[in-house]
Each structure stands twice: as C-alpha cells, then as structure tokens.
C-alpha cells in the first residue's frame, strides 16, 4: 500500500476536472485508488503508463481516458506517490 500525497497544482487541476466532468473525476479517482494499492505495477497496459523525460524526468504518466492524463512521482522505498498534475494534453503540455 502506498501513501498518496498531492501537490498544490494537482489540487487545482482536480478542481478543474471536477468542474468540467464528474465522470472524468470519478475515472481519475479510480486510477488513484489503483495506484494507492500497488503503485504503477498495478496499472494494466490499457492505461499506457510510461516514464517521462525532460522537465518531468523521473515522473510517471498514464492515460486515465484518451485525453485525461495523470502525472506522478513514485518512491518504491518509501512507498509514497506524489500526484503532480492531471488534465488534458492541452492543459499539461
């Protein structure tokens, strides 16, 4: 089981997602629950998880929905996940 932490920017992203679509918010919550239970290892291939590079070096990303992304940092040793950003491709990149 991983501890989940949130950045201030993630909290802002979450408010925007909830305002745009309750269904997207629920889908994101489901992925966060999966991550909490087993980290990135517990996500199946349908989420297209992968490591990022550049300014998000060492971060993970997955596709909650085709245009809803989640970016996080994960520490295996500390069993900690920091949720960094969430949103559409246009919002994040």
What residue spans do the PLM features occupy?
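Basic, Lys/Arg-enriched alpha-helical interface segments
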Residues: 1-66, 75-80, 90-93
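Residues forming the ATP-binding cleft of Hanks-type serine/threonine protein kinase domains
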Residues: 87
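Acidic, metal-associated active-site segment
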Residues: 72
